Amino acid sequence: MEKYIMSLDQGTTSSRCIIFNKKGEVVSVAQKEFTQIYPKAGWVEHDPLEIWGKQAGVAGEALNIARISPEQIAGIGITNQRETTVVWNKRTGMPVYNAIVWQCRRTAGYCDELREKGIDKTIKEKTGLMLDAYFSATKIKWILDNVEGARELAEKGDLLFGNIDTWLIWNMTKGKIHVTDYTNASRTMLFNIHELKWDEELLEILDIPKSMLPEVKPSSCVYGETDEILFGVSIPISGDAGDQQAALFGQTCFNAGMAKNTYGTGCFLLMNTGEKAVDSKNGLLTTIAVGIDGKVEYALEGSIFIGGAVIQWLRDELRMVKTAQETEKYATEVEDNNGVYLVPAFVGIGAPYWDSYARGTILGLTRGAKKEHIIRAALESMAYQTHDVLKAMEEDSGIELKALKVDGGACQNNFLMQFQSDILGVEVDRPEVVETTALGAAYLAGLAVGYWKDRNEISQNWAISRSFAPAMEDEKKEKLIKGWHKAVTKAMDWEERE
């Protein structure tokens, strides 16, 4: 009986299930979008019950599409939107509030208060993260402080916290297992990435009971088995990693200095730094890349909040395009950006600037500016932001990048990939299998159950679909980058501080 690995890929806008074979090829995909909830400006939420329902639904669907039985699944890997925070009652299994999404800025003011007390230095030292509303810690605190009765329940030991991976595993095992992996834990702003444990001092500062937190385990190990009610059989849940770390693993960036960029809702650039946690002097995050083979490996990460989301905005709010694919056609219908720059700081701006008060701007408009120029400027913004992060990474790590591996939806846009290569001045490699996030989770799950032997076997699966080489003169490139940096300064510190 041929065996497969199932990957549950729980993203920011959709829940997906992808089934892979031994060669790391996609056998089937099922996907369902779910509701984005915006209660106030800058606030973003999801319904955890809807996420669980849709995730369970696509798992069954993917099996049907592949025409295989649950018995043929050797293991399940989970990858998830990171930082998004769920708090639920362990007795009833019901969330006490909606999931607060990583993009949500509601705790920015509280982060400012902590910064004034100098807590940001402690946080960076212990967790490798910047003090920011992006991470889970202040979201948990917000729920405890603002949801009626939540703090009392938490003090009694009745509330559990989890990122989406933990929430899914808890539901898949019918409440038997409350666990996360090193990569997800490293994004909470509560986990000491050097000592590999929840940090008592940070829990005290934020007033979060330790009893709420899941057990932290490696990214590749058997956490437990699915309850039979789900598939009719028990299947090992054997891999777990946050989406960006899973993509780094799926891109087989196993050695220090190897890097990938995922062009999803946000853009995420990660560079493997091996067993050394490199402290960033340039506004990047030091994070755990993977916990495997009895050790952890670290990465530098630059988080760009708005990547592909700028295309959704062109499509849904401005109605300039009907589909994301059309952006490539429009961008290539004009020779250049005509001096137009779009800074998509809709929810502030991430690495290496970290300004919660920046807002989106379109600059350099003249009477000759057309829809095509704005669309082109939107695509170019992803490449410029990636450039800024990469330069910071090279400076921190002392490693000059030779090539960049790419994945995520927008990496299918050939105009963007060529422009990215031009602006970076390095080769950009798009792999055959672009489902690298789900693939990384599958690899982690498969290694834990012996489906794949080791990382060498996995590396042989990676193949280039298309390579983009830089073709822009340096002078033109420098001029464009200079214009971009000028535009970013105009977007910063726009929103009034309360």
UniProtKB/Swiss-Prot annotation:
Binding positions for glycerol per the UniProt entry: R82, E83, Y134, D243, Q244
Quick one: a GO cellular component term?
Answer: cytosol
Q: Which GO terms describe its molecular function?
A: ATP binding; glycerol kinase activity
Q: Which residues bind ADP?
A: T12, R16, T265, G308, G409, N413
What catalytic activity is recorded? glycerol + ATP = sn-glycerol 3-phosphate + ADP + H(+)
Give GO terms for biological process.
glycerol catabolic process; glycerol metabolic process; glycerol-3-phosphate metabolic process
UniProt enzyme class: transferase
Residues engaged in binding ATP: T12, T13, S14, T265, G308, Q312, G409
Keywords of the record: ATP-binding, Glycerol metabolism, Kinase, Nucleotide-binding, Transferase
Q: In which pathway does it act?
A: Polyol metabolism; glycerol degradation via glycerol kinase pathway; sn-glycerol 3-phosphate from glycerol: step 1/1
As given in the record, the signal peptide range reads none
Activity regulation: the record says: Activated by phosphorylation and inhibited by fructose 1,6-bisphosphate (FBP).
Reply yes or no: does the keyword Flavoprotein apply: no
Q: Which Pfam families match?
A: FGGY_C (PF02782), FGGY_N (PF00370)
Q: Could you tell me which CDD domains the record lists for this protein?
A: FGGY_EcGK_like
E.C. no:
2.7.1.30
Q: Which residues bind sn-glycerol 3-phosphate?
A: T12, R82, E83, Y134, D243
Q: What does this protein do?
A: Key enzyme in the regulation of glycerol uptake and metabolism. Catalyzes the phosphorylation of glycerol to yield sn-glycerol 3-phosphate.
Which protein family is named in the record? Answer: Belongs to the FGGY kinase family.
Q: How does it assemble?
A: Homotetramer and homodimer (in equilibrium).
Q: What is this protein called?
A: Glycerol kinase
> What species is this protein from?
Clostridium botulinum (strain Loch Maree / Type A3)
